[in-house]
A protein has these predicted regions:
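His/Asp/Glu-enriched, well-ordered alpha-helical/loop segment
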Residues: 333-343, 347-373, 377-378, 383-387, ...
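Short, glycine-/Ser/Thr-/acidic-enriched flexible segments
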Residues: 16, 36, 44, 61, ...
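Divalent metal-binding segments
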Residues: 2-12, 17, 21-280, 295-351, ...
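C-terminal, active-site-flanking charged/polar segments
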Residues: 249, 509-512, 522-554
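A short, polar/charged loop-to-alpha-helix boundary motif
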Residues: 46-52, 516-519, 545-556
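Charged, amphipathic alpha-helical linkers/stalks
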Residues: 553-559, 564-567
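Acidic (Asp/Glu)-rich catalytic clusters
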Residues: 252-256, 282-294, 333, 366-368, ...
């Protein structure tokens, strides 16, 4: 507690987990001028209210610091969000295809229907992708583009016509066009040896006009707020040129319409021109320029293309060029001389080892201490590399890519190799700066609770037990990875990440108790209330009337966001997609989930109005027809 000025906002009757070691729990907080001005008991905080203070009764619910994503492609994702049909969190291919059909029916020519990553075939009960025949049957005339992680893309016949791929199209560098016996493209594109063909093909699609991009970015932030995200570090991305592709996010920042605090890194765009990019950017941009809502965070995740080790575990580990070190050293010296931190994409330990050789060499001439540089991903990092990073004062930003690619990793390298991939717990034990994020929106979903679930349970979204319990994190550790730990990676330690007097007032009220709910429920969490800088940016249920930031309807009027909203198609009637596929399966299945005593009668049971009809309930989940036959 302190003696603050009259607060703008008080939240009370809650159960706050503050992450402040000197004051770990509270029931009330006060906010003044965007920062926490008091954290304590109701008895201490409520008397501070003045006539204009807004008060929100949390009704005994738990509250947490706002979640911060250490690696999110928000700027690029925001420009496209309103055009994309999201299969993130959809449990069955049957439902995914029903969504696709519904979107095809409302999408006008010449627009595409596009599913751009964020899902894996393993999340579906069918454990497969749609066939090209299925896509063509659903959409004979509307172009459909489906990106699966960064390993392949599926195009229907209409999409092949739209992009101009024919029998005469030459095989592109950085990819493979699968063809039939006559040499005609089938519609399957493979990322072999990298994803260049996937990027290039997607770029051929229509783009949203400028005002729609502004609206789209607001809706993407809104979806993140719904999931409890209050901040992120943007990692740049392919086809995201600076400053051209930053004008929309800058416009929103200038208009005070950002509902996510965003630190951004600059990603080089053209091979062999990386040095020129960073010479130009370090002379025209200043590290940390901006505000607490939108600020420059240095370089990366791409520093030089010769160091890019593609993360497709369905393909062999790539061999980096022998001249990589020279190109990387040129760029790192520029960054170190200008005191710009950097982040570097590195999937494999071999890449990390070679990059560390460069960093250690530069450190001999230009000390790297205090630069807060770090590696991204680091799935196969070794203990030796962890120690070298710690010695240089660096960090590791991990993401939940293995929750989406774990099955493929195990197929190629074996289950034992996946037990600590990446070795998050070991890095924490060694005291390395480490935090968590998603790498959304393509190679994984933007849902932070999927990441938190993966950190705690060690399971993929397909249910594979990837990480043994001894290598998993506690819920306290996982939450810190998504809050206070991330502030080192944006050089904002002490400014945010905790519910503590003086820190930025970013917090969430989740729809369940993160510390008490079953592990299997963590991934299904969303926010009832999200507060950024003392402003309610998302409110649902009992808190809907406090919402101050709802954007206008998604544009264009055929946008998938209008119908499906986002993760798990939550915009449709709650539970409807899962109920639909289960009932369809029940009518045709011969599964072994029936009651051993009373037999198998899914169709009868799940069509009834009795408790077995509730697929989320005990009896319905088991498939027992005891009460219905």
């Amino acid at each position: 507690m302190t003696q603050p000025t009259t607060p703008d906002l008080i939240l009370f009757n809650g159960r706050f987990t503050t992450l402040d070691r000197s004051n770990p729990t509270a029931t009330a907080v006060a906010v003044s001028q965007g920062r926490f001005s008091a954290v304590g008991s109701d008895r201490e905080v409520l008397p501070l209210a003045g006539p204009q203070t807004k008060r929100i009764d949390l009704g005994g619910r738990s509250a947490l610091p706002g979640l911060i994503d250490n690696h999110l492609h928000l700027i690029r994702g925001g420009l496209n969000f309103n055009m994309e049909l999201r299969w993130d969190g959809v449990k069955s291919l049957t439902d995914a295809m029903a969504m696709l059909k519904a979107q095809v029916d409302v999408t006008p020519a010449p627009q595409w229907v596009r599913v751009v990553g964020g899902f894996t075939e393993h999340q579906f009960v069918e454990k497969r992708l749609p066939t090209l025949a299925e896509l063509n049957a659903v959409a004979p005339d509307t172009p459909v583009f489906i990106l699966h992680l960064y390993d392949r893309a599926l195009l229907n016949a209409a999409a092949l016509r739209a992009v101009g791929y024919t029998k005469d199209t030459p095989e592109p560098p950085g990819g493979q066009i699968l063809r039939d016996s006559a040499g005609n493209p089938t519609g399957l594109l493979l990322a072999k040896p990298n994803a260049s063909i996937l990027y290039a093909t997607l770029a051929k699609g229509p783009k949203l006009p400028r005002d729609y991009q502004v609206n789209s970015t607001r809706h993407f932030m809104r979806e993140l707020n719904r999931l409890g995200v209050t901040g992120a570090i943007d990692a740049g991305g392919g086809m995201q040129n600076y400053p051209d592709d930053y004008d929309v996010i800058q416009e929103l920042a200038d208009a005070d319409q950002l509902t996510i605090r965003l630190a951004y890194n600059l990603f080089t765009q053209k091979p062999k021109e990386e040095k020129d990019d960073f010479l130009r950017w370090t002379s025209s941009s200043q590290y940390k320029q901006g505000t607490d809502y939108f600020r420059h965070n240095g370089a990366g995740e791409m520093l030089v293309f010769s160091a890019a080790d593609f993360e497709d575990f369905r393909q062999p580990q790539p061999e980096l060029a022998p001249g990589m070190e020279g190109e990387l050293e040129e760029v790192v010296r520029i960054l170190a001389q200008n005191r710009w931190p950097w982040r570097m994409h590195a999937t494999y330990d071999e890449t990390i080892d070679r990059a560390l050789n460069v960093f250690e060499k530069v450190n001999e001439d230009i000390p790297l201490a205090g630069l807060n540089w770090f590696f991204d991903h680091a799935e196969t990092i070794s203990e030796k590399s962890i120690d070298r990073i710690a010695a240089l004062g660096g960090g590791v930003a991990v993401q939940h890519r293995m929750a989406y690619q774990g099955e493929y990793f195990v197929e190629r390298y074996g289950a034992a190799a996946a037990e600590a991939t990446p070795p998050v717990k070991r890095m924490l034990e060694k005291g390395v700066n480490v935090s968590a994020g998603t790498d959304a929106t393509r190679v994984a979903s933007y849902n932070p609770w999927v990441s938190l679930s993966w950190l705690v349970t060690g399971k993929t979204v397909g249910g594979l037990q990837l990480t043994p319990q001894r290598n998993c994190l506690t819920r306290d550790q996982a939450l810190s990875m998504w809050t206070e730990n991330i502030t080192w990676f944006s050089n904002e330690q002490g400014k945010k990440g905790r519910i503590q007097v003086g820190q930025l007032a970013d917090l969430i009220v989740p729809d369940r108790d993160f510390f008490a709910c079953p592990e299997s429920d963590i991934a299904d969490t969303s926010a009832l209330l999200t507060v950024v800088g003392g402003k309610v940016v998302y409110g649902a249920g009992a808190f809907a009337d406090f919402d101050e930031s709802a954007p206008p309807l998604a544009m264009p009027d055929w946008s998938p966001v209008r119908t499906f909203k986002g993760y798990g198609a939550w915009g449709v009637q709650e539970g409807a997609p899962l109920q639909s596929v289960m009932r369809n399966a029940a009518a045709n299945c011969g599964c072994a989930s029936s009651c051993n005593m009373h037999g198998h009668a899914h169709a009868t049971a799940w069509s009834s109005k009795l408790p077995v009809a509730d697929l989320k309930g005990f009896w319905g989940a088991l498939g027992c027809a005891c009460w219905a036959v």
